[in-house]
């Protein structure tokens, strides 16, 4: 994996795949909670933030699978002649999904905008390297989560998986994303629905 190419240098073209025709019936800006019987190893026991969902398909970022990587590891590749700031050793990198796992995405609070930033519903998504340098220098967004890779669904695929009870969906919560330990996020999202995951079966319906 080439960490140096994980985020684009500056081009706004290197943002998330273009998807239009969003309607309120889709799950953009919600969490997907993998049901206990989820067999796909890419998504078993995951919590996923839905970046976009429309008639053309869906894109999301898994937000509870930290890798054995830190922001310091990426910065060492991007700026090999500079020692990463000590704070970057404690900034985890998450596996955002099985698609393009050498490509970086930073989900963050909306008070900052960068060279390749897309505004979401009260959140922002950046794919340019400048956000990493800002975080490293202590002038980045107040809240952020860095992933490599993303999850993608073709047109109608996510709807079929929801109908098959592969997922629960629930409203997005910044407290769950940014203030809850990664290993507790999925359970916290389910709890927000009044659901105990260990009691669910494949026959349970989705929210």
Regions found by a protein language model. Give the residues of each.
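A short aromatic-anchored loop/beta-hairpin motif
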Residues: 3, 16-207
